[in-house]
């Protein structure tokens, strides 16, 4: 049996561009793609913290070091420049590998600079 697990996450990234007339996708600074182990054309889920929108698209490369997060195509209607988003991708993992599987979690500052990288999520406390 396979389980679907969180593979990659860029947490609280700031949307820098919304390009309605661009052919779909989400352009992500190549440094962030690498840090989060996201590949070009990989399916990503985007969760908009500001308005609650959740949608699926695919990642494309933005210039390395540009700190760009550009929501493109029809998805541009679901975000605005300055919105905070979580970008996530999932993997199908065979159950024998689940216990040892660790996601790549990337936390960024308001300017989309990497401030922390982790592979675990702390236990939520009351």
From Swiss-Prot:
Pathway as given in its UniProt record: Cofactor biosynthesis; (R)-pantothenate biosynthesis; beta-alanine from L-aspartate: step 1/1
Gene Ontology cellular component annotations, sorted alphabetically: cytosol
GO biological process, one term: alanine biosynthetic process
Protein's UniProt keywords contain Cytoplasm: yes
Positions with a binding annotation for substrate: 57, 73-75
The keyword Membrane appears for this protein: no
Catalytic activity: L-aspartate + H(+) = beta-alanine + CO2
Record PTM Pyruvic acid (Ser), positions in chain: 25
Name of the top EC class for this enzyme: lyase
HAMAP family: PanD
Protein name, per record: Aspartate 1-decarboxylase 1
